[in-house]
Amino acid sequence: MRFDWSKLGRTPPAGLVVARNLAHHAAQWPTRAARANLKAVPDDSHSAYVWEASHAALMTQGLPAKGGEIRVGIRVPRLEMIITRGDNVLDAYQLHGKTDAQAGAWLDVKLRVLGLKPAGDVRLPYDLPEHPMGGRPHELAMLGRELGELARWFGGSADVLEEFTAKLAGPRASPILCWPHHFDIATLVNLEEGPNARSIGVGASPGDEYYAQPYVYVNPWPRFDAGKLPDLPTPGHWHTEGFFGAVATGDDILAMKDRGGGLLAFVSGAFDIARARLGA
């Protein structure tokens, strides 16, 4: 693994809620840019991000700009919107001291200069909780540690998912993407063809209404009988309310001696259990 798991834990997992909510909202501007300028696909993956470790950023797919393809993203440790071409950062906008509306206006100007459609005209097909700042400027001076830790959770999760998909035998996993609605980074393994195909989602959330901390999940479909659940590898447990899956929380992961190796073993073991139970 490339990620250094010993660097995680500087901030308790449950202490990332504010940073996560701010980053989640900030990341809606890049996805709006993608929706405005890319052809829609049925699974909505045109609107999703990839984790770019070199920038510690969630980045869109390439957008067809004048002069060459560009990407838009959020550099998580700084909560900074960036526009890149290749490996180069063309422009950046630090959100500290600025409102969400100002960030969107900045992006729209840059997109127009590049011959692209503005992000501000896009209406998202889902709702998010109210922006933590309302219409006030972002105050990030006291959130540097939390934003850095949030970025490390994304980086570590992406690394484990890459290791998992690289070693997966049999069915092919989908690309590893971060989804703008729920803000989770995940891959989907379809075990068969068809609209009601058996499948297993493997991913990581930075936290949500179910867990106020990052967690990793393995979600089989269709769900199992909750009364007859098999034992999971350490440190997992079954989550059955709201969604169904095997879960390892951030606290559980940090308590492991070998965090990266242990988490990969949990994900792989839970996947094998789910696949066997689904009969695939």
Tell me what each language-model feature is.
Residues 2-69:
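N-terminal ordered "arm"
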Residues 48-127:
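Long, hydrophobic/aromatic-enriched structural stretches that serve as scaffold segments
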Residues 63-94, 206-254:
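Intrinsically disordered, low-complexity regulatory segments enriched in Ser/Thr/Pro
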Residues 112-113, 118-120, 140-144, 151, ...:
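Short loop/turn segments that flank or connect secondary-structure elements
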Residues 35-44, 116-127, 166-183, 276-280:
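Short glycine-rich, low-complexity/disordered patches
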Residues 154-230:
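Secondary-shell segments that build the walls of catalytic and ion/ligand-binding clefts
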Residues 1, 241-280:
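TerminUS-proximal long segments
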